[in-house]
């Protein structure tokens, strides 16, 4: 408990510094950096409670889901071609990077594909664990570098490259007329959504369940739900960030360090491809470049949606692109692997 309290205090203080400099998702980034440094250099066995992470995702899911209305559904229906086209581009870039890595390193092609696809770290880890032909060390290392690289670099790119700015908000209490406690009434609804999604084995159920439950309530009841208070979202960011930072595995990174340059280059190519496709989406659909880039960024879904919230971007569009790509990855990748890599495949 002492370790967790120390990590929490350090993360909070670093988050205050990032908040002062108007950095997007400051407390999530501070949690990732603090936990990563502590685990890599001091407490190699440090873990963050899954329950705390899931409670953070519950709050984040409500904050994201409340942005869905009848109007956003109509708007999203106009993006069908863009959503699927963007997803195929992301998959294509990932496969090219995986093939290049396979040709120049010791890793087999199956492991490289699982490692580079932006389909969710947890999902790819589970697939690697269940398939004896895949090298779990390779998959986890590549996915970790991709996720950390994107989550840490994208907020800075959005600010300094695309000219976005963080929407002013209170640190602990809401500003303006966003006061009251009506948001508390929605927490049980979001919780039920999380439970149902887990029962249905939905990917990333702890996040998607609350999003879907909140969105359904907002659309069916035709109400504009209250924003969650900043203190709730900041605590959610801290717990999500600390959990992500504790996912860093020093031993895995050292065992697969020869793959590190390829993982970094692959991540940069994915980000570059995201910017290029975002420009196409801006010209075709007329959406802001920040929204388009966060929608295309190669994960994670939670982090990109929270970054969009902090910068006033259209979170419903960001979520639509991110969730469709996530579902495509989780539904098509296992089928593709079974068809292309038969039982005799040895790498």
Task: Kindly label every feature range from the protein language model.
Residues 196-274, 278:
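Transmembrane helical segments that form the transport core of multi-pass membrane transport proteins
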Residues 70-78, 161-177, 222-229, 254-255, ...:
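Membrane-interface helix termini and inter-helical loops of multi-pass transporters
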Residues 4-6, 10, 68-99, 183, ...:
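Entry/N-cap segments of selected transmembrane alpha helices
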Residues 89-90, 120-124, 140-162, 301, ...:
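Membrane-embedded alpha-helical segments of transport systems
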Residues 32-41, 45-78, 213-220, 230-256:
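Hydrophobic transmembrane alpha-helices of secondary-active transporters
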Residues 18-33, 52-56, 79-90, 112-116, ...:
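Structural signature of hydrophobic alpha-helical transmembrane segments
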Residues 8-12, 17-19, 163-223:
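Core mid-bundle transmembrane helix pairs that form the ion/substrate translocation pathway
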Residues 104-145, 287-322:
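Alpha-helical membrane segments and immediately flanking helix-loop junctions
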């Amino acid at each position: 408990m002492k370790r967790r309290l120390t990590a929490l205090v350090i993360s909070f203080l670093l988050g205050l510094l990032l908040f002062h400099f108007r950095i997007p998702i400051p407390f999530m980034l501070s949690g990732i950096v603090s936990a990563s440094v502590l685990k890599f250099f001091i407490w190699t066995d440090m873990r963050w409670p899954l329950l705390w992470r899931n409670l953070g995702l519950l709050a984040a899911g409500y904050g994201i889901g409340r942005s869905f209305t009848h109007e956003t559904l109509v708007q999203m229906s106009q993006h069908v071609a863009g959503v699927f086209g963007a997803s195929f581009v992301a998959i294509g870039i990932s496969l090219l990077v995986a093939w290049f890595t396979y040709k120049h390193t010791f890793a087999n092609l199956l492991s490289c594909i699982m490692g580079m696809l932006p389909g969710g770290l947890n999902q790819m880890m589970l697939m690697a664990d269940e398939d004896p032909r895949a090298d779990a060390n390779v998959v986890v290392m590549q996915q970790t570098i991709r996720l950390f690289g994107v989550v840490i670099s994208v907020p800075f790119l959005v600010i300094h490259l695309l000219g976005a700015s963080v929407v002013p908000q209170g640190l602990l209490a809401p500003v303006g007329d966003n006061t009251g406690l009506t948001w508390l009434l929605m927490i049980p609804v979001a919780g039920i959504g999380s439970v149902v999604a887990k029962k249905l084995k939905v990917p990333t159920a702890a996040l998607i369940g609350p999003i879907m439950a909140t969105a359904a309530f907002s659309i069916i009841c035709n109400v504009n739900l209250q924003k969650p208070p900043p203190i709730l979202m900041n605590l959610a960011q801290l717990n999500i960030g600390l959990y992500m930072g504790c996912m860093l595995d020093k031993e895995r990174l050292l065992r697969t360090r020869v793959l590190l340059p390829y993982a970094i280059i692959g991540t940069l190519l994915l980000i570059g491809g995201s910017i290029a496709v975002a420009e196409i989406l801006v010209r075709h659909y007329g959406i802001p470049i920040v929204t388009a880039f966060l929608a295309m960024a190669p994960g994670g879904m939670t982090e990109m949606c929270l970054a969009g919230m902090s910068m006033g971007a259209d979170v419903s569009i960001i979520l639509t692109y991110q969730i469709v790509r996530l579902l495509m990855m989780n539904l098509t990748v296992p089928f593709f692997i079974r068809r292309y890599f038969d039982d005799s495949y040895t790498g």
